[in-house]
A protein has these predicted regions:
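Short alpha-helix boundary/capping elements
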Residues: 35-42
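Short, charged early-sequence alpha-helical segments and their helix-coil boundaries
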Residues: 42-67
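Amphipathic alpha-helical segments within well-ordered protein domains
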Residues: 14, 31, 46-47
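N-terminal acidic leader/helix
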Residues: 1-24
C-alpha cells in the first residue's frame, strides 16, 4: 500500500479517536488500533516513513513514536 494512503488512514483514525481526549491519550488509542488491526506489512511501511514528515498530524506522530517504542513491527 502506498505510504501517502497509510498516512491519510492514520490521520483519519487519529481524528476519529481524538475528541474529548488529550493528544497523548488519543495517540495511545491509535497505537492500540494499529497494533490490533493493521497487518505487519502496513505497520512496517508506516514506520519506515520519517517521523518528521509534515503530513502526519500531531496525534499520529505521537502514536508512531509510541509504536516504535513497542518494537513489535
Amino acid at each position: 500500500m502506498e505510504s501517502q494512503r497509510l498516512i491519510k488512514m492514520l490521520n483519519q483514525i487519529s481524528t476519529n479517536l481524538s475528541p474529548h481526549r488529550s493528544d497523548e491519550d488519543a495517540a495511545e488509542l491509535v497505537k492500540t488500533h494499529i497494533t490490533k488491526f493493521w497487518s505487519k506489512t502496513m505497520r512496517d511501511q508506516i514506520l519506515s516513513v520519517p517521523s518528521d514528515t509534515p503530513d502526519f498530524s500531531n496525534i499520529s506522530k505521537i502514536a508512531i513514536k509510541n509504536l516504535k517504542e513497542l518494537n513489535i513491527h
